[in-house]
């Protein structure tokens, strides 16, 4: 059992270093099972899973940030946030400097020629690991058929890797389970704050704000909208 979210030298808490290592090992094992020579993910939660990198909500729509994981290699992160690339490298020492600004792409790509910089960058990384052909898994690729065509022209075969990552994430280690328990406890605390504040005349938006405030105070990166409904708004769908 882990004790809270704060690390201490006298209490066993969530071991994030162990969790990062476990997640990377799970991904590599599933890549091996599925015969993948590389996996590229644009999925924010799989970027988090493989590289422990956070894709802010405001930058997700364009799907320009991604991670490349070659067979037998390490994660390579292409990202942009409020941090500079240099600051991101300092913020995430476990990536050992393998952090770069994301090239233009994602949902903005509609033709193969627009992937030229992306392909040059990714194929260069794969070549460093001796991968110049083989099977590449694309996870949550924003323009799948365009990128598939680009990789085929470069001598690779392509598959959808969504199921590979689903299977990798489906078995949690003790640290991930501790995170799930803590998230549930935070949700309980948020609803308790709402319950304490309910009284005649209070606005629904005020109750929603109290719930979100509680979650952020307890360390949430982001929150889903609370559905606070009363009166005629409570009719079931």
Residue map of PLM features:
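A composition/biophysics-driven feature that prefers long, compositionally simple stretches
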Residues: 1-186
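Active-site cores enriched in adjacent His and Asp/Glu residues with nearby glycine-rich loops
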Residues: 30-50, 132, 143, 185-237
């Amino acid at each position: 059992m882990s004790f809270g979210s704060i690390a201490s030298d006298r209490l066993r808490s969530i071991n994030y270093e162990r969790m990062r290592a476990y997640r990377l090992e799970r991904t590599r094992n599933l890549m091996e099972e599925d015969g993948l020579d590389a996996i590229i993910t644009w999925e924010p939660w799989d970027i988090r899973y493989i590289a422990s990198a956070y894709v802010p909500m405001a930058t997700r729509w364009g799907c320009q940030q991604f991670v490349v994981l070659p067979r037998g290699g390490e994660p390579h992160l292409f990202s942009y946030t409020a941090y500079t690339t240099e600051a991101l490298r300092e913020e995430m020492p476990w990536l050992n400097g393998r952090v770069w600004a994301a090239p233009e792409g994602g949902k903005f790509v509609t033709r193969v020629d627009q992937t030229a910089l992306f392909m040059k960058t990714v194929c260069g990384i794969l070549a460093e690991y001796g991968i110049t052909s083989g099977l590449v898994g694309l996870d949550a690729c924003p323009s799948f058929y365009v990128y598939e065509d680009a990789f085929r022209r470069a001598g690779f075969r392509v598959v959808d890797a969504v199921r590979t990552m689903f299977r990798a994430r489906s078995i949690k280690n003790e640290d991930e389970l501790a995170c799930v328990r803590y998230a549930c406890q935070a949700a309980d605390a948020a609803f308790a704050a709402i319950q304490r504040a309910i009284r005649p005349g209070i606005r629904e938006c005020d109750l929603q704000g109290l719930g979100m405030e509680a979650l952020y105070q307890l360390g949430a990166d982001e929150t889903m909208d609370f559905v606070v409904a009363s009166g005629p708004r409570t009719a079931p769908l």
